[in-house]
């Protein structure tokens, strides 16, 4: 979620009215899945932070599938938001707002 690369909520929704919520347990599946989704016309990809491999999967997609716009889901803390940004996330989805998560988001928008 760098200043040049982050997206507003409106930009995300305008570009992709449907965003798959992806749970990945194996980083080897991340790039092939992302490529298949992009080939099918879906480029906004939300990788949830529900597995130990989620950040590595986000990083792999961000590096290997430049047509994809990878985001982080299940962002529950400022640490989650920061880690997702460092892994290449361009947007984040949180189950609830906290000021700490909001501050990280604003710092990267």
Task: Please report, for each region that a protein language model flagged, where it lies by residue.
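A generic structural signal for well-ordered alpha-helical segments
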Residues: 13, 104-105
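Conserved small/polar residues in nucleotide/adenosyl-binding loops
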Residues: 107-109
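Conserved N-terminal beta1-alpha1 strand-loop-helix module at the mouth
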Residues: 1-88
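Glycine-rich phosphate-binding active-site loops on the catalytic face of alpha/beta enzymes
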Residues: 88-102
